[in-house]
Every structure is written in C-alpha cells, then in structure tokens.
Amino acid sequence: MSAGIEYIVKRTNRLHTAGVAILIVAVAISCTGCTDKPDWRVTDDGILEYNKPAPGSDYRLRTLEETDNYTLCEVTYESRGAVIEGLIRMPKTAAGKGKSVPGVVLLPGATVTKEGEQGLARYLEGIGYASITIDQRNLGGIDMEADLEMFLSGVEPIEHRMVYDALFAAEVLRKQPNVDPDRIAYLGESNGGRFAIIAYALDSDALGVVAISTCGYGIDAAVAAGRIRDPEAIRFYRSIDPDTYLSSIRPHHRPGKFVMIHSLNDPIIGYENAQATYIAAGWRKSLHTIETEGHGYSAEMNPFLESELAEIFS
C-alpha cells in the first residue's frame, strides 16, 4: 500500500463518525438549494467539474523584466475567494514576427514558490515556450482532513479550488497576444503534478500534461480492499486522486498526451507508485526515467521535456 493511501485511510477512519453527522447537515443544506458555488460539482463517480473560467479584465499584469530574449511579468487574479499571484515568462522568439508560441501552465511542488520554479520556466523559455507559474494556495501544501470536512459540510474544498486556479491560469495565458491559445499544456512537479493532471483532464482545449516526480493516491485500490467505506468520503477522495481521471478523459477532449518523468531513486515518491499511475492511464502516454537520486525537476530531464513538448505541440 502506498504512503498516500495510508495517509487517507487513517484520516478517513478518524472522521467516519463525525462525518455521518456532518453529512446529515450537508443533505439538509442541499435540500434547501444552498451550495457554496453553483458551478462547482462532483459527480457520483467522484469526478470534479467546473464551468470554464472566463477571465476578462479581472487580472492584472506588471512588467518586471524585459530583455532581448524574454519578458517577465507579474500576474495577479482573483479565483474563488483568493488572490492568486503568478509569473508569466514570454520568449521574444515570436515578437514582431507575427507568430505565436505555445504556452505551459507550470505548477510547482509543495512549498516551492513561483520564483523558485523559474529555473524550469527559464528552460522552457529557452526552447521557445511561454509559461505561467503560480503560487498555489498554501504554497501547494494540502490538508486532506480539513478538505474532507469541508466537502461533507457542502463547502468547496481547497484542493478543488487549487484545480480551478490552474484552469484560470491557463485561460490567462491563452489571452496573451504572443501565445497560441490552441497550444496549451500543463506541467507539474510532485504535488503540483497531481493538480496538473486533474486540470488537464478538465480542460478540454489543452493538448497534454507532463507530470514530474508524482503519482496518484490509488483510492480505488483502497476502496476495493475495504479500507475506505463511507460513500461520501470515497466520492471526495476520488475527486482529488489523479488516477480517477486517467481513464475518464471526456469524449470531446482534444487528442493529447500524458507524460511522466521520474527518478528511479526518488526518495519521496517511489518509482513503483509513479509506475502504477502510468499503467492506469488509458490514452497516449510516455514514461521516462533518470537514475540520479532526487525528487522534482533536474536538468537531466531536459531531453525528455524537449522531445515530449515538441510532440504535444506539433
């Protein structure tokens, strides 16, 4: 059993008794027609659904750096009760040539800031791609127990809102004049990779996702083993598990690709866990490995990133 499943099972058991009482309250709220967000839904099968974000003038840009090779802008936007800050890095390869470049929504791992992710963003800029990197809520940290309590009481969990933040970031990137809105992909590291996978599954216009040093939670395996029994807890945990979405891409989703890159000697997320998630994917996919011990992006992954993004955007 993976560490992710163990974490979830322990908290589900702790909350089971309280959850029944909370669920009764949630049903009462639902019957009165009161919901936290009318465009936030979780299906009976545990699939998260959002209406597509439509940013107008409700985001702000401020130029931080401008060189012969790139422009770096700070972006700020409001998303479901929070102010999200990000950085847009734009290569100048297309400037003044009437061309547009593909764009990547870049989601860092837990505790990593948008500034701390700029090494990867600079690499993407160097091979011709724009990127938007956001400071995720709680800097990507999650509290599953608190989110489950919110869900059982009919309140939109933070982890769901973090997916929406990524979807909003994609729409902001699509609005940039030098970005091709039809060529957008998601790229995430560690916990950011989980959100990247789910956001890609919900974004029917995106072309692919690259997940570095990440894995799903294996919720269905825990349910099958009888370790999680409460139906509403199952529905919530499936909604935050990337594995749930790997075989359920909506029929109208554009042809895309699922890419994983992982160290065989990752000390945080074992390769076997990443492999289990990769096997669960039912669509065009690739898995690349490096041997260097470490967790997250490293320059050793660059050849895989370059070739896979070129294929995704071709």
Task: Identify the meaning behind each predicted range.
Residues 231-280:
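The feature captures the conserved acid-bearing segment of alpha/beta-hydrolase catalytic domains
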Residues 53-98:
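N-terminal cap/lid segment of alpha/beta-hydrolase-fold proteins
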Residues 167-228:
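Primarily recognizes the serine-hydrolase "nucleophile elbow" in alpha/beta-hydrolase
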Residues 153-155, 214-242:
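A catalytic-pocket lid/entrance helix-loop region that shapes and gates access to the active site
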Residues 98-109:
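Short beta-strand element of the alpha/beta-hydrolase
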Residues 1-37:
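Secretory targeting signatures
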Residues 111-164, 221-227:
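Cap/lid segment of the alpha/beta-hydrolase catalytic domain
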